[in-house]
């Protein structure tokens, strides 16, 4: 991601919009923003899904990362119809804590968050954060522990994840054709057949992803991208 490249050059703000698809049909969008602050990198966004998606919903999120792309906090407000869930996650050094509030119920979690562990959430920005820490060549792969956060409770599920770089090419983007790499993401407990694939540019921005491994079934597509100075 170009907000804080390894060279140390810092863009004050990066923002974009993803179109979201279900079974090949448009079903919503995600707008996001990354800004630099004294706190670190502040990531904010809103994702909304509408029919024909089978579960129309809206998520608003705010994440905090260090300048080394380590997630240290994530706040989520998830709305489905009249129901609303609030999830608050934060890292305390090598411990990850979560508090889930839904109606009159509260659930808390606590577990290990070692330095080599990653966090995955429903936005493709977290794919970019994972890529930003690694140098992938064609055929290269990296396996690591990951804390997966997502529906139905926005709680944590620990897993092991594998990223593989499987293809080089040129991909259309809001900025024109760009050199890009295609990655396959899978959980080691399930195998690659249950994974998914996406294209990302040289700055690790996800350009387009797919439902599973089939490139004829788009999942999310970057349709707007802008960078501040």
Where are these regions (language model features)?
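Acidic, serine/threonine-rich low-complexity disordered tracts
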Residues: 2-102, 140-229
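Surface-exposed beta-loop interaction hotspot
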Residues: 92-149
């Amino acid at each position: 991601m170009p907000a804080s490249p390894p060279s140390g050059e810092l863009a004050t703000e990066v923002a974009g919009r993803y179109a979201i698809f279900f079974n090949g049909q448009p079903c919503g969008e995600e707008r996001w923003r990354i800004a630099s602050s004294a706190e670190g990198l502040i990531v904010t966004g809103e994702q909304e899904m509408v029919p024909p998606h089978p579960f129309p919903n809206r998520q608003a999120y705010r994440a905090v990362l260090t300048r080394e792309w380590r997630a240290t906090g994530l706040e989520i407000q998830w709305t489905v119809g009249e129901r609303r869930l609030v999830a608050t996650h934060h890292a305390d050094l090598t411990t990850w804590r979560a508090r889930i509030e839904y109606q009159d119920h509260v659930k808390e979690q606590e577990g290990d968050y070692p330095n080599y562990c990653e966090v995955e959430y429903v936005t493709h920005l977290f794919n970019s954060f994972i890529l930003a820490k690694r140098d992938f060549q064609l055929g290269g792969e990296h396996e690591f522990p990951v804390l997966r956060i997502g529906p139905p409770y926005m709680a944590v599920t620990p897993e092991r994840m594998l990223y593989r770089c499987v293809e080089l090419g040129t991909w259309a983007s809001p900025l024109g054709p760009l050199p890009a790499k295609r990655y396959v993401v899978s959980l080691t407990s399930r195998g690659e057949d249950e994974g998914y694939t996406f294209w990302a540019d040289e700055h690790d921005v996800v350009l387009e992803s797919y439902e599973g491994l089939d490139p004829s079934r788009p999942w999310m597509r970057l349709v707007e991208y802008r960078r501040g100075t």
